[in-house]
């Protein structure tokens, strides 16, 4: 993964594909909602449903909402999956915030 700026490390295409396939293998692929909280250049989006909700503060691909995912207010859904590669920040501070935000509306989280 190449570091760019703003604590961004872009996920390589093959790694994103593997993560999605492994998540589906373990948890299934039938979701009412899929969320990519730190979509960046869209690596995961290539392997997720078209209606995936994708967020990033500095998106670099089409279909990604410009927003800080930690501030997005989403209703809870039982069959909701959050999947992606969020920024870690110093001492994993950001990744913990992404997990906490995800737990407010989703029961299933698959982050690397």
Residue ranges, per PLM feature:
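Class I S-adenosyl-L-methionine-dependent methyltransferase catalytic core
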Residues: 1-112
């Amino acid at each position: 993964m190449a570091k760019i700026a703003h604590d961004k490390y872009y996920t390589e295409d093959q790694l994103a594909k593997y993560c999605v396939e492994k998540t589906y293998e373990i948890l299934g692929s039938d979701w009412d909602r899929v969320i990519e909280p730190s979509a960046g250049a869209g690596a995961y989006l290539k392997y997720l449903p078209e209606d995936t909700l994708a967020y990033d503060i500095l998106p670099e691909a089409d279909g990604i909402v410009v927003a800080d995912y930690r501030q997005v207010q989403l209703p809870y859904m039982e069959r909701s999956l959050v999947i992606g590669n969020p920024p870690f920040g110093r001492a994993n501070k950001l990744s913990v915030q992404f997990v906490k935000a995800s737990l407010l509306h989703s029961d299933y989280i698959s982050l690397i």
